[in-house]
From Swiss-Prot:
Family per record: Belongs to the RavA family.
Mechanisms controlling activity: ATPase activity is stimulated by ViaA.
NCBIfam families found in the cross-reference section: PRK13531.1 (NF010054)
Gene: ravA
Name of the protein: Regulatory ATPase RavA
Keyword Hydrolase: yes
InterPro entries: AAA+_ATPase (IPR003593), ATPase_RavA (IPR023671), ATPase_RavA_C (IPR022547), MoxR (IPR045427), P-loop_NTPase (IPR027417), RavA-like_AAA_lid (IPR041538), RavA_ATPases (IPR050513), RavA_LARA_dom (IPR046898)
């Protein structure tokens, strides 16, 4: 087997070649290529004339030797038009019921069926067997069919509770396409002279039959790590608990996991990663409502849980809470405490300064900076006699903010623990302390916990950086995940700086 990174590069180049001349269809081509390389089916939903059939024709060129079959279904389509006409010779000479399948679906590797829901029951029943078992019953014999990719298309969804639901459930990847939107792309499409029948893929990139068969075995060997399974199970539980969530059969879950394995394999990895789970948004929806619902649920999973974002924020909240508890304990120890001297018949308590406050001018530190008189204040200088008078009789108290300028009036009080508290205009308060009494505002316990959390965040970010090179995931998703991780990192850094 080729080196994983070389294989990933080759598949990327193969996809680029297939996308050439198709505008705003890169994601559809890539997912159809992934389906073809893993033997799955695709349903394309969209209005006529948006290159649905061209996408299917292009996929034939991904392989060195691949035959294609395409057919536009109508209400009058017959099995003979899809699976081949009956052999009159065999019926006449030997009495055998046998179809001539050359050039029809049973001998094609790439199959495109347009307006699929217009097919009759006879076609649908045979098609179900072909998709499920990759076998076709031709008269008395079961013949293996080589189909690698079935692309079915329609401009409408099947009716609910109809006989079409069984076939719809077999379409693993479901893509909703629209006409070209970007102005520049629209112009390029109009003036393009590319022949749609030309093969845009160099022979060196095309997949041989031997490679294809070997890759099917290799895909099955890709592991599903426990953390990734837990994410999948979480998503399943979320969907089960939502009233309008689509029903997802066990069969569809199993086939979807194989698609995730294929995504990992063709991205050069030996295990499914959280990034691969984004593909589930194209596998688990049923209609427009469930498509939006799946987008929302996958975004919650990817930006909140896949790289432990929410778990890290929860841990950070616990660390911050613990830090506040320690700071409160430290605040009680270091706060400037006055001595209560209230008399028996006094309506308000009187206070005196403690013995250590003996200087004529006292500088007291704010345990937390406040904005007072339009100034960020970290300490206040008091005249000792003025402070003693205020403690005894109350009234107005003034102090120099940061020790400079004129003494300014202050909103100050003595709390129940006999600590001096100063408040700003919004009544936010902080206690005052003597210089040298305050200790390090970041306890060693908290500092260590924040460092550990930051290291864990770096590991998660590194994991994401290593996994994000996935051809089959749109770059918009990568941007949202990166933003969610950066938000967590920024909150951790802010906590470290406080």
């Amino acid at each position: 087997m080729a080196h994983p990174h070389l294989l990933a590069e080759r598949i990327s180049r193969l996809s680029s070649a297939l996308e050439k001349g198709l505008y705003e269809r890169s994601h559809a081509i890539r997912l159809c290529l992934l389906a073809a390389l893993s033997g799955e089916s695709v349903f394309l939903l969209g209005p006529p004339g948006i290159a649905k059939s061209l996408i299917a024709r292009r996929l034939k060129f991904a392989f060195q030797r691949a035959r294609a079959f395409e057919y536009l279904m109508t209400r009058f389509s017959t099995p003979e038009e899809v699976f081949g006409p009956l052999s009159i010779q065999a019926l006449k000479d030997e009495g055998r019921y046998e179809r001539l399948t050359t050039g029809y679906l049973p001998e094609a590797e790439i199959v495109f069926l347009d307006e699929i829901w217009k097919a009759g029951p006879a076609i649908l029943n045979t098609l179900l067997t072909a998709i499920n078992e990759r076998h076709f019953r031709n008269g008395a014999f079961e013949e293996k069919i080589p189909m690698r990719l079935l692309v079915a298309a329609s401009n409408e969804l099947p009716e609910a509770d109809s006989s079409l639901e069984a076939l719809y459930d077999r379409m693993l990847i479901r893509l909703w396409l629209d006409k070209v939107q970007d102005k520049a792309n629209f112009r390029s499409m109009l003036v393009s002279q590319q022949d749609e029948s030309d093969n845009p893929v160099p022979a060196s990139l095309q997949v041989s039959d031997e490679e294809y068969q070997q890759w099917q075995k290799d895909i099955g060997a890709i592991s599903l790590p426990d953390p990734v399974f837990e994410l999948i199970f979480t998503l399943r539980q979320q969907l089960d608990n939502l009233p309008n969530a689509p029903y997802v059969s066990d069969r569809r879950w199993k086939k979807a996991i194989r698609l995730l394995q294929a995504s990992a394999f063709f991205s050069g990895r030996d295990a499914v990663a959280p990034i691969d789970l984004i593909l589930l948004k194209d596998c688990l929806w049923y209609d427009a409502q469930s498509l939006n619902l799946m987008q929302q649920q996958l975004e919650i999973l990817m930006t909140g849980h896949a790289w432990q974002q929410q778990a890290m924020l929860t841990r950070l909240g616990g660390i911050v809470q613990r830090r506040l508890q320690l700071q409160q304990q430290q605040s009680d120890k270091t706060a400037f405490t006055v001595i209560k001297e209230g008399g028996m018949f006094s309506r308000r308590p009187h206070y005196t300064l403690p013995p250590e406050a003996s200087a004529s001018t006292l500088t007291l530190l704010l345990q937390k900076p406040l904005k007072l008189h339009d100034m960020e204040v970290i300490h206040i200088t008091f005249d000792r006699s003025a402070l003693e008078l205020w403690l005894t009789k109350g009234g107005e108290i003034r102090g120099k903010l940061n020790g400079i300028g004129f003494a300014q009036t202050l909103n100050m009080e003595v709390d129940n623990a006999q600590h001096l508290v100063v408040r700003d205009i919004s009544l936010q308060g902080t206690r005052l302390a003597l210089p040298g009494a305050a200790e390090d505002s970041m306890p060693a316990e908290i500092k260590q916990q924040l460092e550990t959390l930051e290291n864990d965040w770096r590991q998660q970010h590194t994991r994401f950086s290593e996994q994000q090179h996935c051809l089959f995931i749109h770059s918009d998703w990568l941007g949202r995940i990166e933003a969610s991780l950066q938000d967590v990192g920024e909150q951790i850094r802010q906590a470290q700086q406080c």
